[in-house]
Amino acid sequence: MVFNTGTALLDAVVLSVVAQETEGTYGYKITQDVRKIMEVSESTLYPVLRRLQKDNFLETYDMEFAGRNRRYYRLSSNGMIKLDEYRKSWIEYKQTIDEILLGKKQEIL
């Protein structure tokens, strides 16, 4: 199994972060949560959010916050399916990397 550690990894992380908030979450918080595990700039992340929305993996809605409109993102049903695919691929990819780095075969949980 080959897991694209560029675009696919960032997409998987973004979808996972958004999935943690069932009512949705906003761009700045997504950026902060993603930055806990990888370096990413807002100028990189916002186009990813727009692309995931265009691909029907994310839904958006606007809500007023402190006198301004804030755009919220939440997973669509297609987004849940895609996230599940990414998670399955990641498990296989991680097992292969573990075998190489640790020198032993790992059990898939």
Where are these regions (language model features)?
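Short, hydrophobic-biased segments on the C-terminal half of alpha helices
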Residues: 49-51
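Beta-hairpin "wing" of winged helix-turn-helix
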Residues: 55-69, 74
